[in-house]
Amino acid sequence: NLIQFKSIIECANRGSRRWLDYADYGCYCGWGGSGTPVDELDRCCKVHDECYGEAVKQGCFPKLTVYSWKCTENVPICDSRSKCKDFVCACDAAAAKCFAKAPYNKDNYNIDTKTRCQ
């Protein structure tokens, strides 16, 4: 679920960036999403959105699904025993790892999505 996603992000990025820094970044990080991602980090969010979309197609509710996971040496590890829980956790873990690797450009935070996300 979204609260766990916050924790997974903090696990993967070793506390180097607050999860809120990703909440309104580029065209896809945060609610909704459209257009062309502005950079690598925004592409991570687009892929995460698409992963959640696939979870919904499989009958899951990704924003509400509570799953089991642990943080081992800054690596989120999923540990659920059901299809939906594992799928959603994998979406979140992959996104968090992607966030940790991607450069953060503060100029892409809180952008004007109406003009930049066509």
Swiss-Prot record:
GO molecular function, one term: phospholipid binding
This protein's record includes keyword Acyltransferase: no
Cofactor(s) recorded in Swiss-Prot or TrEMBL: Ca(2+)
GO CC terms, sorted: extracellular region
Catalytic reaction annotation: a 1,2-diacyl-sn-glycero-3-phosphocholine + H2O = a 1-acyl-sn-glycero-3-phosphocholine + a fatty acid + H(+)
Major location (coarse): secreted
EC code(s) of this entry: 3.1.1.4
Name of the featured protein: Basic phospholipase A2 PA-9C
Protein species of origin: Pseudechis australis (Mulga snake)
